[in-house]
């Protein structure tokens, strides 16, 4: 085919190009016509008033472009006024901002072309507001023009503008910090915004802004009496979500605000949470009202903080001298003083019929021991029962136990006489002269148990127990050592350090005694970071021979060291590094336990991730036992860290579910105990149904721990569903003596103190972690991790460490004369009111009672009468003051 033919059949190049151009032109025309149509439609939709506003704004923009400097000023002023009045309420995009959208970049060019002048700063103000809607947010143009504009109050432009400005300040501050650029101008601007937030129910925005700038303490001067409680509530609720040391800075700010308005009881709660003795002393010394001082003494007593208040009556309150009397008053008012026997708890007539019970002597002894524990737990603190404290000593249940069972049976007198020191000592005294060594050892341990949480100037526990530290059998010495640890937990006593340190360091001493001495020192100096105790234990770990490193009691030496750093976070780093340099199994256990305890209850996500990583690593074959123990502790540590923060606690439940499916046996046996710690005395159906499933596991170690954890979860609640599940387990395991023993212990815990007590270590509206309560729970849980060696063998008396966590969940109100004052209170489920405007209700589904009353987990009380004002939040022992004037800021 010729070229002529081709050219005749195909369009020329120019024609094709023209066709393309024509297509593009038509597309552009179509788009323009669409835009024009849209604009015409918008103009047609506008009302006359809006059209007038649009024309006025365009004229003002034109005037800014063309007018002389004199006219520019008036045009800018008019423009500013129109925008300001429209942005004061931002329910929708204000019309002036909408109409000025096409002119934003025109105004930016004008601004850039002008020399520095008052008119330029005025235009910067306008551009700052317009930038909120039109500019590229990554350029922070609202902030840029704000800093270049006039120094008028940013709040003139409305709430939405101020919030937008605050977010840009936070972003700009972060980028400048990375570049190490100065930030003084940002801080100055932030401090002009904070008062606006605080006076417009936006306390959360003010706190967040200053917290991002690392200057949370600067909020204190701006806080007023009417918003102080809301500010502090938001600050304290944020603490669990922040890393160290930001959490400490937040708490110190809340403390400063409370002190500013003389809210001393709230300030003291924050100081206790900080565990700062200097602040605690300052708060106590600042109180001039004797009633307020007494209330503060009761608050310190709950945390077992050792202090001298300089007054006998105050010291009695601080030392829990009358705690037994208060508890007996509660029991009498609730008609609970009649003692119960184990059969009342077991309700064996409701269990499925069984055969072959009691066939062996071993089983019978185990059953009697279980009954001993159940009897002590159910009647704890009531100073009466029908098995042990009987008139005819020959019929006493103590002598129905054998060998090591006698230790626990005799020590149970201490639990029955819990907090009632005088009566407890008089009843235990005769057993100190017993020829039976186990009975004598039990009496020594019982003395420690009855003295838990109660201080006495005469120091009867130390006077008696110190005589048995150096001489006598291992059983007597072990009971005396642990008894001292229980009696003086949290006392921070240097004289006890001198007594117990030689036992820790003596390499010829049995490993059991050294480890118990280290544990007792940990209990006595819990959360103090005491350098002498730490160096003593570290030195012992270095000097102990290799054979001692494999001793099962070694975990308690590691725990003793870990408890010193309870809740101290980064302050434990030096000790962790030292432990890394020490060889041996106990040092590895101590390393992980110190890490766990130092972050206990903080909810620190990074540490939870670190522990989950340890759990996920398959242990190597050559060091299997050591590594699996560390994984066991790590699984437990996840719950220990997450327990103080509800969201974190919810999240780890899913991880635990996965671990039970795919984890190593060493991890699986720790998960039920972790669930028990996470939800102690808080029977959530989701958790105890899960534990019920694990209680039938093929691995008996898992089953034992799941059964015990069911007791922890339901402790002191008398939960009917849990009681039914435990009765079913008693039938299921009727031929397995160890499992049945665990079921009985769990049943005893469920009815702890006849349903009046709790094991949950948190108190004061679940904000403060009780150091000694946590230490007691950890001691028992670590023993349960190897139940066959300890609790199910001859060391079942370790269960008495749980006494440290026992406290009555009562609300008792006292009058100004110190006498019991029954008043009406509303008790209901606590409601999270953080960040809500106004004064919302803090409880829901409430029922009116007359004090004394019991408070369940997550329940809160408020007075139903205006005749009195409580000196602190309604929990524990509260003093009521006759109402003479309205209190602006309530507890």
Curated annotation (Swiss-Prot):
The ranges of the PC repeats are: 408-441, 442-478, 479-513, 517-550, 673-704, 705-739
> Where is this chain compositionally biased, Basic and acidic residues type?
17-30
List GO molecular-function terms, semicolon-separated. enzyme regulator activity
Which regions are flagged for Low complexity bias?
1-12
GO CC list? ascospore-type prospore nucleus; cytosol; nuclear periphery; nucleus; proteasome complex; proteasome regulatory particle; proteasome regulatory particle, base subcomplex; proteasome storage granule
- Phosphoserine-modified residues are 10
Name the segments for region: Disordered. 1-48
Which keywords accompany this UniProt record? Phosphoprotein, Proteasome, Repeat
UniProt entry tagged with the keyword Phosphoprotein: yes
The biological process GO terms on file are: proteasomal protein catabolic process; proteasome-mediated ubiquitin-dependent protein catabolic process; regulation of protein catabolic process
Role description: Acts as a regulatory subunit of the 26 proteasome which is involved in the ATP-dependent degradation of ubiquitinated proteins.
**How would you summarize the oligomeric state and partners of this protein?**
Component of the 26S proteasome. Interacts with ubp6.
Family as reported in the entry's similarity comment: Belongs to the proteasome subunit S2 family.
Please give the name of this protein: 26S proteasome regulatory subunit rpn1
Q: From what organism does this protein derive?
A: Schizosaccharomyces pombe (strain 972 / ATCC 24843)
- Name the lineage: Eukaryota, Fungi, Dikarya, Ascomycota, Taphrinomycotina
């Amino acid at each position: 085919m010729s070229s002529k033919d081709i050219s005749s059949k195909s369009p020329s190049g120019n024609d094709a190009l023209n066709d393309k151009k024509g297509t593009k032109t038509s597309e552009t025309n179509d788009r323009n016509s669409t835009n024009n149509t849209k604009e015409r439609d918008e103009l047609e939709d506008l009302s006359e008033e809006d059209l007038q506003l649009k024309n006025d704004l365009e004229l003002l923009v034109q005037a800014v472009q063309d007018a002389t400097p004199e006219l520019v000023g008036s045009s800018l002023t008019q423009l500013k006024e129109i925008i300001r009045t429209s942005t004061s309420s931002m329910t929708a995009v204000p019309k002036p901002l909408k109409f000025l959208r096409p002119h934003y970049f025109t105004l930016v060019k004008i601004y850039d072309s002008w020399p520095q002048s008052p008119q330029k700063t005025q235009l910067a103000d306008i551009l700052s507001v317009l930038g909120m809607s039109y500019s590229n947010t990554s350029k922070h143009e609202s902030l840029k023009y704000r800093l270049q504009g006039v120094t008028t109050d940013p709040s003139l432009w409305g709430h939405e503008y101020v919030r937008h400005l605050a977010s840009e300040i936070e972003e700009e501050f972060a980028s400048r910090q990375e570049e190490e650029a100065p930030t003084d101008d940002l801080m100055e601007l932030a401090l002009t915004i904070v008062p606006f937030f605080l006076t417009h129910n936006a306390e959360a925005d003010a706190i967040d802004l200053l917290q991002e700038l690392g200057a949370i303490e600067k909020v204190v001067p701006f806080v007023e009496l009417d918003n102080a409680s809301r500010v502090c509530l938001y600050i304290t609720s944020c603490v669990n979500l922040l890393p160290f040391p930001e959490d400490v800075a937040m708490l110190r700010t809340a403390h400063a605000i409370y002190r500013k308005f003389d809210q001393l009881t709230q300030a003291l709660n924050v100081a206790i949470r900080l565990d700062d003795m200097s602040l605690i002393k300052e708060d106590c010394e600042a109180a001039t009202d004797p009633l307020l001082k007494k209330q503060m003494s009761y608050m310190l007593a709950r945390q077992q903080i050792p202090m001298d208040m300089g007054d006998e009556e105050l010291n009695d309150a601080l030392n829990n001298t009358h705690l037994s009397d208060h508890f007996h008053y509660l029991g009498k008012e609730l008609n609970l003083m009649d003692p119960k026997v184990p059969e009342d708890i077991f309700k064996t007539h409701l269990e499925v019929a069984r055969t072959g019970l009691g066939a062996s002597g071993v089983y019978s002894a185990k059953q009697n021991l279980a009954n001993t524990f159940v009897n002590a737990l159910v009647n704890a603190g009531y100073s009466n029962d029908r098995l042990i404290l009987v008139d005819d000593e020959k019929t006493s249940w103590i002598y129905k136990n054998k060998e090591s069972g006698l230790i626990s049976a005799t020590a149970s007198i201490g639990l029955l006489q819990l907090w009632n020191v005088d009566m407890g000592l008089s009843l235990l005294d005769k057993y100190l002269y017993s020829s039976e060594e186990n009975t004598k050892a039990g009496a020594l341990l019982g003395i420690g148990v009855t003295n838990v949480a109660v201080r006495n100037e005469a120091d009867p526990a130390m006077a008696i127990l110190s005589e048995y530290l150096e001489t006598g059998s291992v059983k007597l010495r072990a009971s005396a050592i642990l008894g001292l640890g229980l009696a003086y937990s949290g006392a921070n006593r240097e004289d006890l350090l001198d007594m117990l340190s030689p036992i820790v360091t003596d390499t010829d001493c049995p490993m059991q005694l050294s480890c118990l001495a280290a544990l007792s020192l940990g209990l006595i100096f819990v959360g103090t970071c005491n350098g002498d105790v730490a160096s003593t234990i570290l030195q012992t770990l270095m000097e102990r021979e290799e054979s001692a490193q494999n001793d099962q009691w070694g975990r308690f030496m590691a725990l003793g060291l870990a408890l010193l750093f309870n809740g101290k976070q980064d302050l434990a780093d030096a000790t962790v590094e030292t432990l890394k340099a020490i060889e041996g199994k106990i040092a590895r256990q101590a390393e992980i336990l110190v890490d766990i305890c130092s972050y206990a209850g903080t909810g620190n996500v990074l540490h939870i991730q670190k522990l989950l990583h340890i759990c996920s690593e398959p242990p190597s074959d050559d060091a299997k036992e050591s590594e699996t123990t560390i994984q066991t502790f790590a699984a437990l540590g996840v719950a220990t860290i997450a327990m103080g923060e509800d969201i974190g606690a919810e999240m780890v439940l899913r991880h635990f579910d996965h671990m039970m499916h795919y984890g190593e046996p060493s991890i699986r046996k720790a998960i039920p105990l972790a669930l028990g710690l996470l939800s102690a005395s808080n029977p959530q159906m989701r958790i105890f149904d899960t534990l019920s499933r694990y209680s039938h596991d093929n691995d008996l170690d898992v089953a034992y721990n799941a059964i015990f954890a069911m007791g922890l979860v339901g402790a002191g609640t008398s939960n009917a569903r849990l009681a039914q599940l435990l009765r079913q387990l008693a039938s299921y395991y009727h031929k397995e003596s160890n499992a049945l023993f665990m079921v009985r212990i769990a049943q005893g815990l469920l009815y702890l103190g006849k349903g009046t007590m709790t094991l949950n270590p948190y108190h004061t509206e679940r904000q403060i972690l009780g150091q000694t309560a946590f230490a007691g729970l950890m001691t028992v849980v670590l023993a349960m991790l190897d139940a066959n060696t300890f609790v199910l063998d001859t060391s079942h008396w370790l269960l008495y460490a749980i006494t440290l966590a026992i406290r009555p969940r009562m609300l008792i109100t006292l009058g100004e004369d110190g006498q019991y004052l029954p008043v009406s209170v509303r008790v209901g489920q606590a409601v999270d009111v953080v960040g809500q405007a106004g004064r919302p209700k803090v409880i829901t589904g409430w029922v009116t009672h007359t004090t004394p009353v019991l408070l369940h987990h997550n329940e809160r009380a408020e007075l139903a009468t205006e005749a009195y004002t409580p000196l602190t939040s309604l929990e524990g022992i509260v003093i009521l003051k006759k109402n003479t004037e309205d209190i602006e800021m309530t507890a």
